[in-house]
Amino acid sequence: MRPDRAARGRGPGALWAAPALLVLLAAGCRHPPQTAAAPATPPPDEPAPAAPAAPEASSGPIPVTELPAGGISEEDREFVLSHPPIYSENGQATWYVAPYKGRKAANGQVFRDDALTAAHRTLPMGSLIVVTNLTTHQASAMRISDRGPFVPGRSIDLTIASAKAIGLYRMGTAPVRIDVYQTPKPIETGGRWCVQIGAFKSQERAEKMKSALLRAYPRANVIEFSGEASFWVRIRPLGDSREEAERIVRRVRPTQGDAYLTRLD
């Protein structure tokens, strides 16, 4: 799915002139980008669970008191059971696999669908988290190893192993709570950031979008993903500043739609 977390993307900026932005809108945003579809739900061999309700706002960190053994190190398991989470959020989760299997994830390691890992746009790479399925109330610890999902309305993508661990595999998607227990870097400060825009099956269309963006954002670039929508355009602000990346998202999203603040480290 991704970049070199390079993907996951999650200097003082220059002032952009209004004419430059108008050129951008005219040249690059006539056609909505093609977005990657959610994975097909595997055929159930038992009655499928009822459709999940929309996720509620997080009521705050909730310590985990039980956690199945296996899949994560005993050290990680003991850390989660003996510490409160430092950050929590609610959102929608799904799982991903082929054609990502065998290719490098954003952390530079080969993607494994049997590992308890997940993709998130803004949590620091390597963060230790617990994901709880709010429909089945099953939970599992895992590590952030990739960037994404770059699909509207989704907060986190799980490997097949992670999805099975929380009862999400046959559901396809479900509301979840994400509790963060350990991060190699601060969540809210620092970091290197970019903005990912558009999802294209055609490299030619991605290059056209890049050309339009270059007029206002000289550091725009096209990157290739493993997936149905294989090409994305990424803008890196000067200094990889989060504040400037957020400003770019606000400028681009009203017309482009698929613009995602993404952490690189």
Where do the model's predicted regions map?
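Extracytoplasmic
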Residues: 201-265
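Secreted/periplasmic proteins
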Residues: 2-5, 9, 29-194, 199-203, ...
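Sec-dependent N-terminal signal peptides
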Residues: 10-22
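Generic alpha-helix initiation/capping and coil-helix boundary signal
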Residues: 19, 86-87, 238
